[in-house]
């Protein structure tokens, strides 16, 4: 018997077409907090109502975020049971860890089930699981717990990514693209889940960066099914992933970051963050779309991680974008806050639903080509070129 050539073996292993997003699912905790009443709630549950001047400043911060409402896991009842979470810097990691190890996989499972339901395939066909979260570090990891909750095959190939933050929603699509295109018939379940339990803490007059986090972050999970060569009549493509790249802005590691300590997770942000991101997005776009010949960024649809209102304003101004381009990202941010790695999946879900509701020609607001952007600590910029499908 003639031995198969290495080239033939590799060809047989690879998919024929590009990686394709086949379904999107999202989930949030049940507890909805309106932004206009959140300052009263926050200062009450942290026993800080005597800090009236600081509360007034926090109220102004909440208004400036442009967030209308957020979903959060923590409730007054949970905080009463674990009062250390309400202090500013009391050692409390064990209390926080006890919560996230259990709750991160649970919320992730809700989003994953929604994506799997839309996809319509059998869980036994899921070959890979890629999961990211800032919190929930444990052994076995949150990926193991999620696979157990979903009843995924024992042979599913799992990859867990911890402590990465906002850009990882896009980064996981880069990883899923490589998996799907290099493993024929692979179906990749991609899940991002963020719960702010690690970073919740009481207010302090000396730490306005911590207050900024309390004003803007929300809890949520997003999931996608990614695979190449969709089964006709069974699987319904939403977007093709045509390319995916990452770049790191030099000498920017101090612009945004977090540190895991006994007190939980602490964040820092530099005021120059919006400008740094806006100044570097253009180069990433130019490199990504050069093979396609697109140079006008108003001729593509946008699935962008919002970050915050100032970041979107800076990108819009720097690139000369029409207001409609980031409208979906702004809408998601105002309705859910910054859910870090999961946010961009909510943006994609909103875009494809809005495109259908408004009778657009494609899932990309009527346009063929688009970009999915993520940015996070590093500063790391993820650029994913998408091709929409007809509606």
Swiss-Prot record:
Pathway as given in its UniProt record: Secondary metabolite biosynthesis; flavonoid biosynthesis
Catalytic residues identified in the record: 166
Keyword flag DNA-binding: no
GO biological process, one term: flavonoid biosynthetic process
Signal peptide limits: none
Pfam families from the UniProt entry: Chal_sti_synt_C, Chal_sti_synt_N
EC number: 2.3.1.217
SS bond partners: none
SUPFAM superfamilies from the UniProt entry: Thiolase-like
GO molecular function terms attached to this record: acyltransferase activity, transferring groups other than amino-acyl groups; curcumin synthase activity
Family: Belongs to the thiolase-like superfamily. Chalcone/stilbene synthases family.
PANTHER family membership: CHALCONE SYNTHASE, HYDROXYMETHYLGLUTARYL-COA SYNTHASE
Subunit structure: Homodimer.
Protein name: Curcumin synthase 2
Species for this entry: Curcuma longa
Gene label: CURS2
